[in-house]
UniProtKB/Swiss-Prot annotation:
EC number(s) per entry: 1.1.1.-
Taxonomic path: Eukaryota, Viridiplantae, Streptophyta, Embryophyta, Tracheophyta
One GO cellular component term: cytoplasm
Designated name of the protein: Probable aldo-keto reductase 1
Known tissue expression: Expressed in roots. Detected in leaves, stems and mature nodules.
Record GO terms (molecular function): aldo-keto reductase (NADPH) activity
Gene expressing this chain: AKR1
Binding site for NADP(+): 209-218
Functional summary from the UniProt entry: May interfere with the nodulation process and inhibits nodule development.
Induction note: Not induced by auxin. Up-regulated in leaves by ethylene and salt stress. Down-regulated by abscisic acid.
Keywords, alphabetical: NADP, Oxidoreductase
């Protein structure tokens, strides 16, 4: 397959330009696999940039702050003005089966200040609310983000796993540039409400886990899930469900051969070609996987191809929920906030 060129695209309608394929940095400090050594993690980021990826995604909670620090160190070896850094705030603690979500104005500002220090930058290109605090009116959270934009500390604002009502209300306070949300061949529940709303409002869509948390790359099928991986607790990777889901992988594998692509490339190409406003952020710790992901840009799919791939993964055939057990209430479907001028006491 010919080497794919990564074109710049506009994310949202405020002028934010990013590479059509982004890179999710979470796994570099450990999540589905062991964390990489610091220099190895920096090398992966630098390699991605050398191949044309300029849009890098991190968060304060990844690796308990280590991820932002790692990205910041990599940035020191790259031209800052050519890179777009997205980071996130909002998950105050990451317990299991519960997380503490915080969206007060004071918390927003505190996280931004510490994020700037960890990344060692003067501004954050895209700052997301990682999860919605359902006890704080979204107008208060976004109101503080708007101030950070006015102060030059943040360039663009995003939301992650936000409900339609929350997106609309947030956008009325300050333009939302991007919504980051799970979207892949086996997670398509955003297509009825979230995608049309984002397009109505001119908001870009940043799919996370576009390869189904590695499933379409063969994780759990052609390679074992590491014993210390968080995927061990994920419903779709549980033994009985995984056995059923292997049928889905085999179908995509068959279609991939027709397109001279790997299953991962076909699955990622399907996401990439959902629209110009769609910028997925697959992550990996391996250079060969990164090269494969970039190769997905060279897989050209017709409307008929896209439909055939879509129909090869009937959502009713997917065994297991998309969210870890006990964490469903943190998904976009439950991410409404109280009316403005009211708060839920906690």
């Amino acid at each position: 397959m010919t080497q794919a060129q990564i074109q710049p695209v506009k994310l949202g309608t405020q002028g934010f330009e990013v590479s059509k394929l982004g890179f999710g940095c979470m796994g570099l400090t450990g999540a589905y696999n062991d964390p990489l050594q610091e220099q190895d993690g920096i090398s992966v980021i630098k390699y991605a940039f050398s191949k044309g990826i300029t849009f890098f995604d991190t968060a304060d909670v990844y690796g308990a702050n280590a991820n932002e620090l790692l990205v910041g160190k990599a940035l020191k070896q790259l031209p800052r003005e050519k890179i777009q850094i997205a980071t996130k705030f909002g998950i105050a603690s990451r317990g299991f089966p519960d997380m503490k979500i915080e969206g007060s104005p004071e918390y927003v500002r505190s996280c931004c200040e510490t994020g700037l220090k960890r990344l060692d930058v003067e501004y954050i290109d895209l700052y997301y609310q990682h999860r919605v605090d359902t006890s704080v009116p979204i107008e208060e959270t976004v109101g503080e983000l708007k101030k950070l934009v006015e102060e030059g500390k943040v360039k663009y604002i995003g939301l992650s796993e936000a409900s339609p009502d929350t997106i609309r209300r947030a956008h009325a306070i300050h333009p939302i540039t991007a919504v980051q949300i799970e979207w892949s061949l086996w997670t398509r529940d955003i297509e009825e409400e979230i995608v049309p709303l984002c397009r109505e409002l001119g908001i870009g869509i940043v799919p996370y886990s576009p390869l189904g948390r590695g499933f379409f790359g063969g994780k759990g099928v052609v390679e074992n899930v590491p014993t210390n991986s968080s995927l061990k607790a994920h419903p779709r990777f549980q033994a009985e469900n995984l056995d059923k889901n292997k049928n889905i992988y085999e179908r995509i594998e068959g279609l991939a051969k027709k397109h001279q692509a790997t299953p991962a490339q076909l699955a990622l190409a399907w996401v990439l070609q959902q629209g110009e406003d769609v910028v997925p952020i697959p992550g990996t710790t391996k250079i060969k996987n990164l090269d494969q992901n970039i190769g997905a840009l060279a897989v050209k799919l017709s409307e008929k191809d896209l439909r055939e791939i879509f129909e090869a993964v009937p959502i009713g055939d997917v065994a297991g929920g998309r969210y870890y057990n006990g964490l469903d209430h943190f998904s976009w479907k439950y991410a409404n906030t109280p009316p403005k001028d009211s708060k839920i006491s906690t």
